[in-house]
Amino acid sequence: MADLNVEIVAVERELWSGPATFVFTRTTAGEIGILPRHIPLVAQLVDDAMVRVEREGEDDLRIAVDGGFLSVTEETVRILVENAQFESEIDADAAKEDAASDDERTAAWGRARLRALGQID
């Protein structure tokens, strides 16, 4: 299968760039799965999104993202976000505490991290 070129960039760092076979996330229009040769589009991510990047012969990447935008061409997926963390960087206890916050923005970031950990859908 042909690969997608995927770039995930947060404000303070380029998080990840490389080939992938599939990308899944949630936009304000709903869930989306992207395969190579997908129709071009631009979409806004939900505030509590998780991006899953499937790679041939490697473990999936699970990344919590804090809002942002998704740009898709036939061969490239670019995800531009305010903040992002790999699953391995997430403190589960802090994410749970944030998810219970009265502040909606903090709660959304907590939920995104819990999604990346696979603790909520």
Swiss-Prot record:
Belongs to the ATPase epsilon chain family. It comes from the Bacteria. CDD domains: F1-ATPase_delta. Its main location: membrane. Produces ATP from ADP in the presence of a proton gradient across the membrane. HAMAP family: ATP_synth_epsil_bac (MF_00530). GO terms for cellular component: plasma membrane; proton-transporting ATP synthase complex. F-type ATPases have 2 components, CF(1) - the catalytic core - and CF(0) - the membrane proton channel. CF(1) has five subunits: alpha(3), beta(3), gamma(1), delta(1), epsilon(1). CF(0) has three main subunits: a, b and c. InterPro entries: ATP_synth_F1_dsu/esu, ATP_synth_F1_dsu/esu_N, ATPsynth_dsu/esu_N. This is ATP synthase epsilon chain. NCBIfam families: ATP_synt_epsi, PRK13442.1. Transmembrane segments: none annotated. It comes from Mycolicibacterium smegmatis (strain ATCC 700084 / mc(2)155). SUPFAM superfamilies: Epsilon subunit of F1F0-ATP synthase N-terminal domain. It is found in: Cell membrane.
